[in-house]
Amino acid sequence: MTLLNPYFGEFGGQYVPQILMPALKQLEEAFVSAQRDPEFQAEFIDLLKNYAGRPTALTLCRNLTAGTKTKLYLKREDLLHGGAHKTNQVLGQALLAKRMGKTEIIAETGAGQHGVASALACALLGLKCRIYMGAKDIERQSPNVFRMRLMGAEVIPVHSGSSTLKDACNEALRDWSGSYETAHYMLGTAAGPHPYPTIVREFQRMIGEETKAQMLEREGRLPDAVLACVGGGSNAIGMFADFIDDTSVGLIGVEPAGLGIETGQHGAPLKHGHVGIYFGMKAPMMQTSEGQIEESYSISAGLDFPSVGPQHAYLNSIGRAEYVSITDDEALDAFKALSRSEGIIPALESSHALAHALKMIRETPQKEQILVVNLSGRGDKDIFTVHDILKARGEI
């Protein structure tokens, strides 16, 4: 029996080998206890404020919406220590690991942002850290790999499968099944077996809470819609959670359409996948006709994931949130537009959400509306990728 509901509608659950059930039970018990412990909460809030730099700014775009009646705000998770929203929940999970008496952290990473966040939290709190990363992602995210190693983490390349995030997740789970007595698996997104989707949401929900308070202070009302990119979905559920009951606010999640949905080279399982069991949960996922997990694709390493968190699947199924997709090229255009118009270089992941916001504005330029894009991370890690693409196109 679980203490918390392991499902969101039909999605979620705990589809793991029996050997991991005691570890998940211990984790759930520690989380429930910590949520009720004022000392734990005070330490978490102190780290968020005085180490990570919360609250993050809500920035009104000055130039990007010129000639339209839209006010476009950016929730600046890119300003957080570590460079992305990932820092929020790893601090919470690292404190939970200490609470459970663990001495080691196992993590997986795609873009490297969760790896960097895990490494900094472990350095701060005195935990050993080993991070699994697809060999392909190590190539395209070398600055983040060096950051992790600089902070004392062991980065382990994964060469199996497509050598990306999916394979890193599998290796991390395999490691944990043999080491859970001393190690905590610090999952990087709001997916996987229960209680991870709930834990990650609760340790990210300050994004939406702050946004709501900042909007009321700045505009005296809530936004018409909030937008966030969706890979596994942690930054999006962090933004959405506090707005779910505010039905006047649209929730828009943006998946990667990659080279185009019709090519099959994408990472949009919510709208174009089938429900199955993967990574310890029941959720939509990209599958072959034989039912095997299909390789996902995105220009953005952090969105290159063949499934999605169960709460997003549920919000989609009941129509509370809308999920759309943006291609590599559209994300690149948004990346360039924000850099040139506002002097803010966004992560390629966040550029997907920004691209859809810009598409909405172009379609109804005279509509008076307030949109908030969760700028989940900064683009420093992506400048070499973008440079090579623009150079190949003759744009630079």
UniProtKB/Swiss-Prot annotation:
It comes from the Bacteria. The keyword Cytoplasm does not apply. The keyword Mitochondrion does not apply. Coiled coil: none annotated. Pathway: Amino-acid biosynthesis; L-tryptophan biosynthesis; L-tryptophan from chorismate: step 5/5. GO terms for cellular component: cytoplasm. It catalyses: (1S,2R)-1-C-(indol-3-yl)glycerol 3-phosphate + L-serine = D-glyceraldehyde 3-phosphate + L-tryptophan + H2O. Keywords: Amino-acid biosynthesis, Aromatic amino acid biosynthesis, Lyase, Pyridoxal phosphate, Tryptophan biosynthesis. InterPro entries: Trp_synth_b_CS, Trp_synth_beta, Trp_synth_beta/beta-like, TrpB-like_PALP, TrpB-like_PALP_sf. CDD domains: Trp-synth_B (cd06446). Its cofactor is pyridoxal 5'-phosphate. One of its GO terms (molecular function) is tryptophan synthase activity. PROSITE patterns: TRP_SYNTHASE_BETA (PS00168). The modification N6-(pyridoxal phosphate)lysine is found at residue 86. Its EC number is 4.2.1.20. The beta subunit is responsible for the synthesis of L-tryptophan from indole and L-serine. PANTHER family: TRYPTOPHAN SYNTHASE, TRYPTOPHAN SYNTHASE-RELATED. Belongs to the TrpB family. Tetramer of two alpha and two beta chains. This is Tryptophan synthase beta chain. It comes from Serratia proteamaculans (strain 568).
